[in-house]
Every structure is written in C-alpha cells, then in structure tokens.
Amino acid sequence: NVFTIIGKQLGDAMARKKDTDVHSLYGSLNGGTTLGAATKFMKASNVQGAITYAKANKFGSQIYILHHPNSVAYLSKEAATVASSGTHELSSGWSADLLKDFWSGLKPMNGVSIFEDGNLAVDSSDDATGVIADKTAMAVLKSVDTRTERQRDASLRATEVVITSDYGVFELDDTRGAGLIFDAAALATNN
C-alpha cells in the first residue's frame, strides 16, 4: 500500500525534525559552555574529563552523553569500553525499549551512558556538537500529537498526505548540561 510507505517516510521525517530541534539547544546550554574541542577525537580521556566536569559542576545524577556515531566509533575503537554481548546495558533510569536503537553499546563510563545519533550535524571541518547533560536539562512539550491526514486535490488528480504536530523544545534547567564538540570524521573502511 502506497499510503503505508508514505506514512512511514513522513513519520521518519517528523522524528528527524524533532531530533534536530533538540540538537539545536546543545550549543546554548550552560550559557554557551562547550566541552571538548574542534578537531579533537572523542578519546576516553576527553570523555572522562567531560564527565568529571559535569559531576563537579552538579549537572545532576542522571547524566548522559549523546554524540555522532563517527565520534563514538573512535571512542569504541580507542578504548576497552565495548560491552560484551548482553553483559552491560543502559545505566538505570533509562527506558531501554525507547532508547535501545540509540545506545552505543559501550559500557557506561563512571555511570554515564553514551548514546549516538546520526542526525547530529557535521560541519565543514568534520566536527559535531553533541551534549553531556542531565535528563532534566531539556524538555519537549507536545500540545498536539503527530497526526497524518489525507486531503484530496482534484486539480492535481491526486491525494495529498499531510503530517502535523504541535510541540516545543526548550531548556528546562540551563545549568544541567553543556555542548560537547568532537571530531566526527568517518573512520576508514579500507585499512
């Protein structure tokens, strides 16, 4: 059914839109404080430094990191943090059924789960701004859930499929997070 295919594509597009709306908040958290640096890799020592900063500055008790898969892959390649099959899971307090597709599979470092998201924008220098934050730093508020409707347009001799949603993303507590900049260049596949 063509409407099922279109509905799936529209749903995926709306999810990406909401995702990137949240990403746009990262650079302004904590008064624009950013950790990490452009052209620097997501090494275990850099991640540990960011975690220490977050804990020392009282970001909260449910801290997480979200970054681009290319950055997280460098960490995975560089460090012995890869979880063996099923022995390590998300830190407690996370909804595994909702976040399993974004969890990096890395052991939590100092109790901090690391997630990856390919929707993070990579700039012309191959850097991306992710986030280290507490769960209470940002929020999404929905007044109208996502709806899909069909609308017949006789002049086009077609049926349009329209998707709508009314929501907002905002900083709930600015002091509980910071942008996290690391290199996000793709790892070589031909070594």
For the regions a language model picked out, list residue spans one by one.
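Long, contiguous amphipathic alpha-helices that act as assembly "spine/axial" helices in icosahedral shell
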Residues: 1-31, 57-59, 65-66, 150-169
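Sequence/fold signature of self-assembling virion shell proteins
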Residues: 78-191
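Flexible, active-site-adjacent loop/turn segments at secondary-structure boundaries
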Residues: 20, 24, 33, 73, ...
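Extended, solvent-exposed, turn-rich assembly/linker loops in the middle of proteins
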Residues: 27-106
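Generic hydrophobic, helix-prone segments enriched in Leu/Val/Ile
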Residues: 26, 47-55, 112-114, 120, ...
